[in-house]
C-alpha cells in the first residue's frame, strides 16, 4: 500500500475566463476569492445590492470594476458569473443572464423544487452552462477517496457514515431566520451531493432535522439521515451543528468502509 498514488487535484483548464461576482458576502470573501487567487484566475468585477459592500470587497482584493446595478454587471460577454445570493434571489438573476453565458450558482438551487425546475428550464432555454456550488466533491481529500474507490482499493463498499458534532456560527447569516428549511438545503447538502457523486442516486432518503434552543428563530440546525442503497450498503449521517462545549471534542468525520479496506477522512477546520 506504500507504492500507490491517489489523485488529489482537479485538472485545471487550459483556458480561463474572467470572473464577475454577483453578491459580495462572506462566501465570496472568505472562500471563493482565496481559491481563485490561488489559481491565478482573473476576477474582473463585482456587484452587490449594498454598493458599499461591493466597493469594500473591490478595494480589499484589487477588483477593477464595481457595478452600480445588476444590468451593468450582466452586460458582459465571455465571462463566468459567480452568483452568491440567497436562494429566493437566484431565479430572477438567472432569468437575466445573457444567452450562451457561464455561471456558478450558489446552493441551494432556489427556495424549493418548483424554483429549481424553473432555473433548470431557463438555463436550457438560454443555453447557459451552469453549475451548482457543490465544491466538496472536488476537494483534494474527496478526489483521493474517489480515486481509491475507482482503483478498487477498498473493495466492495458496504458502509458509509458521516458524523458531525461541532459548532457552526449560524448568527453570521441572519437571513436564514426567514427560511423554512435551513440545515440540509444551506449546509449539509454538500454531504448528500458528495455521496450521490460517489455512489449514485439512492433509492430513498429518510431524514429528520431538529432545532436547538440557542437558535430559536432557525427552522433547524441538526439532521439525522439514512440513504437507502442496496441491502448490503448502509449509509447514515448524524449531523449536529450546534455543539456547545468547546473545540476539544468537536469532530467532522467520514468513514467509507469496504470489504478490503476502509477510509477515514477528517473534514478540516470545523468553523
Residue map of PLM features:
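Predominantly a Rossmann-like dinucleotide-binding segment in NAD(P)-dependent oxidoreductases
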Residues: 136-216
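Hydrophobic residues in well-ordered beta-strands that form the structural core
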Residues: 105-106, 130-132, 161, 237, ...
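N-terminal Rossmann-like dinucleotide-binding module
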Residues: 1-61
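Rossmann-fold dehydrogenase core element
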Residues: 118-136, 155-162
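Short active-site oxyanion
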Residues: 18, 41-45, 77-81, 182-183
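Contiguous beta-strand/loop segments that form the cofactor/metal-binding neighborhood of enzyme cores
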Residues: 1-5, 186, 192-270
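Aromatic/hydrophobic pocket-lining residues that form π-stacking "cages" and hydrophobic walls in ligand
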Residues: 54, 93, 119, 144-145
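Beta-loop-alpha module in the N-terminal Rossmann-like domain of NAD(P)-dependent dehydrogenases
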Residues: 61, 65-122
Amino acid at each position: 500500500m506504500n507504492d500507490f498514488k491517489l489523485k488529489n487535484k482537479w485538472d485545471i483548464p487550459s483556458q480561463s475566463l474572467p470572473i464577475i461576482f454577483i453578491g459580495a458576502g462572506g462566501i465570496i470573501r472568505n472562500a471563493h476569492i482565496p481559491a481563485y487567487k490561488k489559481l491565478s484566475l482573473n476576477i474582473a468585477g463585482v456587484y452587490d445590492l449594498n454598493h458599499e459592500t461591493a466597493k469594500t470587497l473591490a478595494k480589499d482584493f484589487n477588483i477593477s470594476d464595481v457595478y452600480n446595478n445588476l444590468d451593468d454587471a450582466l452586460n458582459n460577454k465571455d465571462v463566468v458569473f459567480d452568483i452568491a445570493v440567497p436562494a429566493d434571489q437566484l431565479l430572477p438573476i438567472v432569468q437575466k443572464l445573457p444567452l450562451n453565458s457561464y455561471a456558478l450558482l450558489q446552493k441551494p438551487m432556489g427556495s424549493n423544487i418548483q424554483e429549481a425546475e424553473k432555473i433548470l428550464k431557463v438555463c436550457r432555454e438560454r443555453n447557459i452552462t451552469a453549475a451548482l456550488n457543490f465544491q466538496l466533491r472536488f476537494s483534494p481529500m474527496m478526489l483521493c477517496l474517489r480515486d481509491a474507490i475507482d482503483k478498487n482499493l477498498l473493495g466492495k463498499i458496504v458502509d458509509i457514515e458521516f458524523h458531525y458534532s461541532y459548532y457552526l456560527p449560524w448568527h453570521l447569516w441572519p437571513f436564514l431566520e426567514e427560511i423554512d428549511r435551513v440545515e440540509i438545503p444551506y449546509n449539509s447538502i454538500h454531504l448528500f451531493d458528495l455521496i450521490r457523486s460517489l455512489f449514485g442516486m439512492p433509492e430513498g432518503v429518510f431524514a429528520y432535522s431538529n432545532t436547538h434552543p440557542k437558535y430559536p428563530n432557525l427552522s433547524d440546525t441538526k439532521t439525522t439521515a439514512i440513504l437507502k442503497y442496496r441491502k448490503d450498503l448502509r449509509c447514515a449521517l448524524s449531523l449536529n451543528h450546534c455543539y456547545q462545549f468547546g473545540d476539544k471534542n468537536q469532530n467532522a468525520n467520514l468513514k467509507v468502509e469496504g470489504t478490503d479496506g476502509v477510509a477515514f477522512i477528517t473534514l478540516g477546520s470545523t468553523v
